[in-house]
Amino acid sequence: DKGNVPDGTYTGKAPSFGVMKEMELAVTFKDNAIVSIETVCAGSATQYNEDEYSNIYATVEEKLYPRIIEAQSLDVDAICGATVSSNAAKTILRNVIDANGGNSAGWNIPVEKSTEVVELRDYDVAVVGLGSSGVASFLSAAENGCTVFGMEAAAKIGGNGTNTAGPLGVNPAAQVEANGGENFVDPDELYTAWMEYCEDDAKGEIVKLFIDESGKTFGWLADNYDFAFLPSMFSFYDSHGWKLWTMYSGKDGGSKDDAYNAAMAKALTYNEKNDYKTELRATSLLKEDGKVVGVEAVAYDGTVYRVYADCVVLADGGYIGNAEMTTKYTGSVWHTKGMTQCDGFGISQCLELGGALYNPDVAVEDHIAALDNIIRSDDYSNDDKSLLTSLVLDLNYQMIDSKGQSFDGNYNGLGLAFNAWEAGANYYVLINQEEYDSIKENGLISYNVPMFFGQGGAYTEGTPVSNLDDIMEMGKAFGDVIVADSLEDLSQQLGMDIALSDVHGQTEGKIYCIKGAAYVYSTCGGMDVDTNMNLVLEDGSSMENVFVVGNNSLGTLNASNKAYVLYGGAAQGWALTSGRLAGQIAAERFAG
């Protein structure tokens, strides 16, 4: 029973992916049917200076809402790549229905799935995943004469490549020219430093290949497609100060999404057979007599596609969306800013083929520390939310890791945002009673504004935080604050032993514990590859028609159980460069 919602337009709100405002929708009913869903606020801004409307949210507006209206059901699947926004929209719809005479449970009408099987034959290359590495593979193979079919599980292409600032490139020609013709680094010195940082655990021939080829990728994308790179290069955390990465976008003020979409549109013109589909998730590799001959995938509507190709490029972005794999290889299930449709398909399939892992346990890509549960509710002020965030980032207080050990978030000078992963999935800031009272009476020791997920609150240093009790109550409501009477009490509430005898000298009195977390983009380890980007098997041989690119093979550039290299943009640079090289080699072997 759906109940009966009177004709009219109703508005509703719910927290979504953004950190500034809740999603707000206007939903129109006629004859107890949803006839329109309009966006009032997309709720997508992940930073105080971002637009609330994002390209990820656009996939919800363009795909989810029409499907709900067509099916008159809330059982429509969430949009892959926009799950949080999809679920927020469904929450709003349920609340609107229930608040206006309807019964949202009655709207859970099963949506029939297709049983069709589509076979696509005679492709030279099938690309699984159309983030940076997959798009680069597609472009490179297509421009060199291959017929190419690509598939992307999400509803849009570009993946994390549309969310990151930019890639690493060693001495790219245009930027060197803008630098007066002077190289930014000596390649041999960079190679030596790279291998020293990785304690010789990275694969030397791949590191050298990346150093030699990454700069060329900038020119390739800028000269042939709608990508634009700043003329300046930048340094990152590395102590040498080498300028090895830059920011990129679409040309003529376009976005990264514009650049990826335009590039793929151009690649489709290279021959009439080239094609790609979004919302198409690979489920297995097709094999005949032990040889890989293509990919089987399922579309959002249930249609099964069997794509037969001479070679396959596995470009599906690592395994950050696979809890079992992240627990096995990195020790935790992580909070993410990156795309969680990256579920380890490529790596799992490589292992079934007898592929060799290479540093699958490289640390996750972490540049963000924040509250465990970022407070997205409009019921609280951004000032209060920002004050609590400042405290969870404050190195002046005692911190412990996920095992209850004392944790120094800046032990190496790189800062908490870079080091938070070393605490495990969570870290905790412990404030003793004296410190707490000082904040109320004298203000914060320091006001910490995060690089990401900043909510734009205002605070004047030295101002007493007289409403600190209210801020702590807000944190408690979202599971971010635990108030304990003692270390023993805190240990019981957290469910772990705490290896401290005091909190900054306090042995008695309340402890105010704020729960923080690393927010990560992706995993950084995976399979072994050779210099042709081919999968290396356990016996040391290579599989010449299986290419493994991007995060799926990023472990070859990094060290086991260590943060990935400190030069900036390494993951993005590898994605674009490994894809370019894979497409080029695939064309040499399989075109025509």
PLM-predicted stretches and their roles:
Residues 143-163:
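Glycine-rich FAD pyrophosphate-binding loop
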Residues 42, 284-286, 483-560:
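A glycine-rich dinucleotide-binding beta-alpha-beta segment and adjacent secondary-structure elements
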Residues 120-150, 587:
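N-terminal Rossmann-like FAD-binding beta1-loop-alpha1 element of flavoenzymes
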Residues 2-108:
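Active-site- and interface-proximal helix/loop "cap" or "latch" segments in soluble metabolic
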Residues 302-373, 572-581:
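Glycine-rich loop(s) and the adjacent beta-strand/alpha-helix scaffold that form part
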